[in-house]
Regions:
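Short catalytic/metal-binding and nucleic-acid-binding patches
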Residues: 1-346
Length: 346
């Protein structure tokens, strides 16, 4: 596709270093392709969790993406990540392709497992204390209400990810989820060595290492939002427990349970109602109006500058510079972009 063609007509995204994101990726037609499984011998013994960890570790260090929290649900996945170099688009492209291809081979699927859209990744920002839990919607956003000491938007989004199996009515606690869900303690740092899944990647594959290290931790930029790491854990655990209690009340303590989850076919599909055409936010500030106004202004300024550069390119001008944070037009087509803005001195 030539630059300026149909593929570039969608709203451009800006990727800036030092940004937190909530990442969501959904399976096509809400199919349960990521359903929790266990290695039971046979030709394909690697679990979906194993495939996720290998693919993530394979590209995370290269692109400077640091994983803070993860939950693999049956038909979608949630992550909270820190994008150190402004390359989250490249990371997601490479990681998701490898992960999807391995899962596709595992189940003998003729097509990919993820929806064709880029997925959802919300920029997280806003250090103002979050709204009361009663004022939260089902997706961790705020409906209003006064601030409390529950923590920052980052705290609440991490707790939302970790509580997902409970909120969905599947298990009574995150610890009971048979799939992969991280814990609050993982924010202090956790690393595991993951072997190359030989069922999907050849033993003599020079591009993919025999072993990679999958790591999780809160970066210093996250801990800096709190007095110290202990305060971060306390705030996150408190938010998580409030979400769990709220979900238990909502489901009247009736959950599907581990055995029923494990018995779910990877070829089954979710049948619950889902509204069609819901708008997907690109920023989440959770009630911090000052941060929201600033981010919206920055986003509009970026899109305006991008549009001006793109129109100049279409008009025949070849020496075009795109705004800082431009992704595809810079990384794929090689057009220069402005330098990243220098952070203000503290």
């Amino acid at each position: 596709m030539r630059p300026g063609g149909a593929a570039d007509m969608s709203r451009p995204h800006q990727y800036l270093p030092g940004t937190f994101y909530e990442v969501t990726r959904r399976c096509v037609e809400r199919a349960h392709k990521l359903t929790p499984d266990y290695a039971r011998g046979g030709k394909y013994s690697s679990t979906v969790e194993h495939l996720y960890k290998y693919a993530t570790a394979r590209f995370a260090k290269r692109y400077g993406v640091e994983v803070m929290a993860v939950c693999l649900m049956a038909n979608h996945m949630h992550e909270i990540v820190f994008d150190r170099y402004g390359k989250i688009d490249k990371f997601l492209q490479k990681r998701n392709a490898m992960f999807a291809n391995m899962v596709k081979v595992r189940y003998g699927l003729p097509a990919g497992i993820f929806e064709k859209s880029d997925g959802k990744y919300n920029r997280l920002e806003g250090a103002r204390p979050f709204a009361k839990l009663d004022d939260l919607d089902g997706h961790g956003g705020a409906r209003g209400g006064g601030p409390t000491s529950t923590g920052t938007v980052l705290t609440e989004k991490i707790s939302y990810v970790l509580a997902n199996p409970v909120a969905a009515g599947l298990v009574a606690s995150p610890e009971e989820w048979p799939g992969f869900v991280s814990s609050v303690e993982d924010l202090l740092g956790k690393s595991v060595v993951v072997k190359r899944p030989l069922e999907y990647l050849a033993q003599n594959d020079a591009k993919n290492a025999p072993e990679v290290t999958f790591s999780m931790a809160a970066p210093p930029e996250a801990i800096a939002q709190f007095a110290n790491s202990a305060a971060m854990l306390e705030a996150t655990e408190g938010a998580l427990q409030r979400r769990i209690r709220s979900a238990r009340r909502r489901h009247a303590q009736r959950f599907a349970g581990r055995l029923r989850v494990l018995a779910t076919s990877p070829h089954a599909r979710a049948t619950s109602y889902e509204p069609f055409g819901r708008r997907v936010p690109r920023i989440t500030t959770a009630g911090d109006l000052e941060a929201a106004r600033r981010l919206i202004a920055e986003m509009r300024a970026f899109r305006k500058a991008y549009r001006i550069a793109l129109e100049a390119l279409k008009a025949g001008k070849r020496r075009v510079t795109f705004p800082a944070g431009t992704g595809k037009m810079h990384s794929t087509y090689g057009f220069p972009r402005e330098a990243y803005p220098v952070p203000a001195a503290a």
